[in-house]
Amino acid sequence: MPGSAKGSIVDGPDGQPVGSRHIAQAFANEKYFQPRPSAVDYNAAGSGGSNLGASNPKLRERVVETLKGRTEASVPADAVTTSGSGLDPHITRANADGQRDRVEAAWAKQLDPAKVKTEVTAALDAATFRPLGGLVGGDPLVNVLELNLDLTKRLAGR
């Protein structure tokens, strides 16, 4: 795994480090895809999952809050649940597809909507992979940081 001994740091368009491909981070800008919710507020020093059980009203409140802004009929579980570490850098392709309209609308405020749609599709397709090359099944995944950096290169770098 090249780079893993150095933390798998990913550089942004300016060559400066922007994150690690193995640790989720929040993206505040509506132009970007969002990772799974984090029980530890994306704090890599204190990783951990939520201990809220299915019968806990606080879990329901958090899920309801997270669902705001999602318009698809069936929201993927990873859009509203935390991972065991709270730092999973991947989301399912279904989760990413559910965020598409918001991301495309945000970029289309400044750029041609048709171009935005084409570039978002290309970025999603390039970022999508299956764990272990699809040998064991599982949902297609997307690395959120790498997807957002590709979007920046495709849409803001022009």
Question: Where does each model-flagged region fall?
Answer:
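Flexible, solvent-exposed loop/hinge segments and secondary-structure transition points
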Residues: 1-99, 103-106, 130-131, 135
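Soluble extracytoplasmic domains of inner/organellar membrane proteins
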Residues: 80-158
